A protein has these predicted regions:
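Short, acidic Ser/Thr/Gly-rich low-complexity loop/linker segments typical of extracellular
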Residues: 47-59
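Bacterial Sec-dependent N-terminal signal peptides
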Residues: 1-27
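A short, solvent-exposed loop/turn motif at the edges and junctions
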Residues: 47, 73-89
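Short Pro-Gly-centered beta-turn/loop motif in secreted/extracellular proteins
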Residues: 61-71, 77
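Alpha-helical tetratricopeptide repeat
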Residues: 23, 170-188
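Short, ordered, surface-exposed loop/turn motifs in non-cytosolic proteins
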Residues: 31-45, 133, 193-196
Length: 200
């Protein structure tokens, strides 16, 4: 029994039983709407691993094992899907020396999907997170971000512009409807039946 307890103590103190994972957490935000129902889909080495459905707070919390390639997809019906790529390959000696990497926080903003705008930029990851030996930490691939950030910004600006135009058209349509409705009420009050019908 004593030998068993000693063995158990050795195992518990071993670096191999330390929780070896990278924590990823954050929030999904949607302007003028709730993130409730957003799906956070996790694929590991090309295979679906997990899926979280968010509540109205939009918070997510993930734990990714080391030595794997992940894609985190943020999806909501009617909205543009965004993908983050995370590679958790870390040299074994680095994990033994420092297994507790600080959590990585992500803030994901989703925009409504629109027609007649090329959204293909979002078929690829909006960011890539990898381990950097010189920092002994995880950081985003700056060269990759520099290559796509302008196109992402231009596409999102085009989406927002179309949404603003659509909202303005809806407001104008509502104004015209209200105007015709009021004319109909006025004609109805004067018992000008045909004029009222034409307005409605």
């Amino acid at each position: 029994m004593k030998n068993l307890l000693i063995l158990l103590g050795i195992l518990l103190s071993s670096p191999f039983v330390v929780a070896q994972h990278l924590a990823i957490n954050g929030n999904v935000a949607i302007a003028d709407n709730s993130p409730e129902g957003t799906r956070v889909v996790v694929t590991k080495n090309g295979n679906k691993l997990d899926e979280q459905v968010l509540n109205k707070k939009g918070h997510f919390d993930l734990k990714l094992a080391f030595d794997a390639d992940y894609k985190i997809s943020f999806e909501k019906t009617g909205y543009i899907t965004k993908i983050v790529s995370i590679n958790t390959e870390v040299p074994e000696e680095s994990i033994e020396n420092n297994p507790d990497f600080p959590p990585v926080k992500l803030i994901i903003n989703l925009l409504p999907s629109v027609e007649k705008i090329d959204l293909s930029i979002f078929d690829q990851p909006i960011a890539i997170l990898t381990y950097q030996a010189e920092l002994d930490d995880f950081t985003f691939d700056k060269s990759y971000s520099d290559k796509i950030k302008d196109r992402i910004a231009q596409t999102e600006q085009a989406v927002k512009k179309q949404l603003a135009a659509r909202d303005a058209a809806a407001i104008e349509q509502e104004r015209k409807f209200t105007e015709l409705f009021n004319k109909g009420l006025e004609s109805f009050g004067r018992k000008a039946w045909q004029a009222a019908i034409d307005s409605w």
